[in-house]
Amino acid sequence: GGGLLGNLERILNKRYSFLLERKNLFSFNIKLFSYLMKQANLTEREMLKTFNCGYGMVLIIDNNDLQEVSKILNKLNQKFKIIGKLKSTSGDPEVLVV
């Protein structure tokens, strides 16, 4: 449980927070998630804490590996997109929508 935010928070260690790019939220099916948000009267944050928002899997990889991982995913006909990045933190790890 915990939706996309909860899933991302669980994999963070104490040194990093995750910056989730707002422009990529719900992008696999914006109409569906906008409809759900409106019908359920949910905020963006509540949506992200409740649903995975179309993301079946999140890979966190080193930027140096992006080209190779992209090649592999393309070869497997897997759709993917970059949805954010890690940021060093001295506080508690968290997911921030930016």
Give the residues covered by each predicted segment.
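Glycine-/charge-enriched secondary-structure boundary and capping motifs
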Residues: 1-98
